[in-house]
Amino acid sequence: MLTITSYFGFLLAALTITSALFIGLSKTRLI
């Protein structure tokens, strides 16, 4: 149970970092 929770937490963190990085890159290219 703990491994599944930590896995989903890691997946959510990776997704958030990727999306934030992608948005930052898009804003940089937009300007």
UniProtKB/Swiss-Prot annotation:
It is a single-pass membrane protein. It is found in: Plastid, Chloroplast thylakoid membrane. It comes from the Eukaryota. The chain crosses the membrane at residues 4-24. GO terms for cellular component: chloroplast thylakoid membrane; cytochrome b6f complex. One of its GO terms (biological process) is photosynthesis. Pfam families: PetL. InterPro entries: Cyt_b6/f_cplx_su6. The keyword Metal-binding does not apply. Its main location: plastid. GO terms for molecular function: electron transporter, transferring electrons within cytochrome b6/f complex of photosystem II activity. Keywords: Chloroplast, Electron transport, Membrane, Photosynthesis, Plastid, Thylakoid, Transmembrane, Transmembrane helix, Transport. Component of the cytochrome b6-f complex, which mediates electron transfer between photosystem II (PSII) and photosystem I (PSI), cyclic electron flow around PSI, and state transitions. PetL is important for photoautotrophic growth as well as for electron transfer efficiency and stability of the cytochrome b6-f complex. The 4 large subunits of the cytochrome b6-f complex are cytochrome b6, subunit IV (17 kDa polypeptide, PetD), cytochrome f and the Rieske protein, while the 4 small subunits are PetG, PetL, PetM and PetN. The complex functions as a dimer. Belongs to the PetL family. HAMAP family: Cytb6_f_PetL. This is Cytochrome b6-f complex subunit 6. It comes from Solanum tuberosum.
